[in-house]
């Protein structure tokens, strides 16, 4: 790749005061800067303690200097790290010294960008650095570290290799028709294609779990008026985020609350009560509620356990089932269990949905059970070696690849169109390449790395 030859410098530690502060340099001038600032020749990859010198050989600070000649460094270039005292004035003096020696200020994420351009890490690994820094829970940090170590990338590479093998077989049959390979009669292409589709489906599911841990899960609270939806929102938020009254229809619009459960981000959405109404404002609220339900990662369907309709809550509002057809993403909340006397409990039903009996208004009434359930939905304390962090753009690329394979399979089985299958396989491979950076536009790379910290 065409890697810039300018030497860059930046403060690599967070703003503010601390015991230690780091200034990082990368580029062809790093070796000369190391000698000028330390006043001596440095042994590569060894820590040297001593003064940091100005142009007039005045002592700016003292600390540890480390020199890593390329390509055996983080960026693949010559890298210098100055580890001094963590005061902002001291660090700024060291940074100014680097600029005097011919360095320029690094852009946000430029060190990681150079590591990517020098094939020291792929794009998914580079993004994992930022995810590890921004992790809001121990599980999110573990997943980000696994992605940084290449767990996610390896899954994508394995899929890509399978696609390449399949493309070779398909395109050989197209280019050499005299070999008379019959796609359908042979059965080999279909079996290979189905194997790739199955593996892609598994990776997509695991990536979705990783994205929930990174970006947060959108939880929509839905149900009839006066079922206790707003009370449940307040209980989860730990404050009076929503107005609670005995008057049906108090909540008429979407109310959003961002909360954390053991460091795990949740975007909780309270919605208008689901009912037929002639009130135009409330009707708009119901429409927005149904839209929120269709977009949710998880739906908490709240029912009043004291009401007769609680016996079959899903039958009360067929539009709900139309918007959220997957029962595995629905948690039925039987609220007001303290009034019915039913035990606080969680039950997984035959169709896949979960039922929790609790009371949103009573202390110690099952809310901890609900919190644990929501954490489990996000993959909290997941010990699987397959867990990794992922981003929304990764999911989009995986979905696009999956759609291309589905389309290619249909073209093959319905029309025997090997040429169309070959094009779909190419598109699927390109989508996977966008995850690791094998196929990425300059605009995409710029957007990704500009979101990083300066010095990373």
Swiss-Prot record:
Residues noted as binding K(+) in the record, renumbered to the chain: 226, 245, 247, 250
Alphabetized Gene3D superfamilies for the sequence: P-loop containing nucleotide triphosphate hydrolases, Probable tRNA modification gtpase trme, domain 1, tRNA modification GTPase MnmE domain 2
A molecular function (GO) term: metal ion binding
Gene Ontology cellular component terms for the protein in this record: cytosol
Residues where Mg(2+) binds: 230, 251
Keywords, sorted A to Z: Cytoplasm, GTP-binding, Hydrolase, Magnesium, Metal-binding, Nucleotide-binding, Potassium, tRNA processing
EC number(s) from the headed UniProt entry: 3.6.-.-
Binding site for GTP: 226-231, 245-251, 270-273, 335-338
Domain of life: Bacteria
Residue intervals of the TrmE-type G domain: 216-379
Cofactor note as given: Binds 1 potassium ion per subunit.
Chief location bin: cytoplasm
Cofactor(s), by name: K(+)
HAMAP family: GTPase_MnmE
Protein name from the UniProt record: tRNA modification GTPase MnmE
Species per Swiss-Prot/TrEMBL record: Pseudomonas fluorescens (strain ATCC BAA-477 / NRRL B-23932 / Pf-5)
Gene name for this UniProt entry: mnmE
